[in-house]
């Protein structure tokens, strides 16, 4: 077998696998959105416990039974407000 016919058979063989793997043969006019939400399983019988380990009671106003606020750190943002400015490298080279 010469190289041209071998290459042609190889391409035909690969095309058969790619044709079956692709979804082009069953393409639709509309696009369906895929849900990418991950849900966490939880026992329904268990008592709801807050972040402090205390059991919560039903509240009449404000947040609901299964809601709580998370604490926010006070102070400047450490990524944007540095305590010291960045240092520049020392250059001991003296021009003549």
UniProtKB/Swiss-Prot annotation:
GO terms for biological process: cell surface receptor signaling pathway; cell-cell signaling involved in cell fate commitment; innate immune response; maintenance of meristem identity; meristem development; regulation of meristem structural organization. Glycans are attached at residue 76. Residues 68-96 are annotated as: Disordered. Residues 1-21 form the signal peptide. Coiled coil: none annotated. First detected in heart stage embryos in a patch of cells between the developing cotyledons. In vegetative and inflorescence meristems, expressed in a small cone of cells at the meristem apex. The modification Hydroxyproline is found at residues 73, 76. Extracellular signal that regulates meristem maintenance. Acts with CLV1 as a ligand-receptor pair in a signal transduction pathway coordinating growth between adjacent meristematic regions and controlling the balance between meristem cell proliferation and differentiation. Interacts with the extracellular leucine-rich repeat region of CLV1. Interacts with CLV2. CLV3-derived CLE peptides interacts with a tetrameric complex made of two CLV2/CRN heterodimers. His-81 seems to be essential for the activity of MCLV3. This is Protein CLAVATA 3. It comes from Arabidopsis thaliana. The lineage of its organism: Eukaryota, Viridiplantae, Streptophyta, Embryophyta, Tracheophyta.
């Amino acid at each position: 077998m010469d190289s041209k016919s071998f290459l042609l058979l190889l391409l035909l063989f690969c095309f058969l696998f790619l044709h079956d793997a692709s979804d082009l043969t069953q393409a639709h006019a509309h696009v369906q959105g895929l849900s990418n939400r991950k849900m966490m399983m939880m026992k329904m019988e268990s008592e709801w416990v807050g972040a402090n380990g205390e059991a919560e009671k039903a509240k009449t106003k404000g947040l609901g039974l299964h809601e709580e606020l998370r604490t926010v750190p006070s102070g400047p943002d450490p990524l944007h407000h540095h305590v010291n400015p960045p240092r520049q490298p020392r250059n001991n080279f003296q021009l003549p």
